[in-house]
Amino acid sequence: RVYIPKSISKQVLSKLKKQIATIKMGSPENFENFMTAVIHENSFDKLSRVIKKVKKDRDAKIFVGGGYSKSKGYFIEPTIVTTSNPKYYTMENELFGPIVTIYTFDDNKWDKTLSLVDETSEYALTGAIFCQDRYILEESVKKLENCAGNFYINDKCTGAVVGQQPFGGARG
């Protein structure tokens, strides 16, 4: 899930759309492909059901992607869902596939959004915040201290580096 302030949402969404268009998908034997199929048919079926649900719902829409096929593997296109509902299904449930949901919030509702981020799911493997304002960054880090197992500040979520950082545990 991604939370983006309204003041920069159009710019961010435009960049994401361009970047996703460059992702090559196909066989893992071809090293030009950045993405390959999802792990198994059950995963494919779950993710394709989610995409179908989004296409029918009023609270969300497919911004980019949304295609899938199991004719030559279990392929799900990289998909961005946008929603006006911060409690939408794809914001609260872990999908474990190439689908991300973006919620755009009013800039003046930053505190409320931080609470949403912290309360949305009892599970969160990784999280990150990107911010240029030191005050907001400091406040955010305090409020989100326990929101994810690994938390990055102005850096992409890369997951744990085994042997280099602690990993695992549970929220208190």
Question: Model features per residue range: what roles?
Answer:
Residues 1-8, 37, 80, 172:
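Short beta-strand and adjoining strand-loop segment in the mid-core
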Residues 1, 17-49, 67-75, 89-97, ...:
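Flexible, acidic loop-helix segments that line cofactor/substrate-binding pockets
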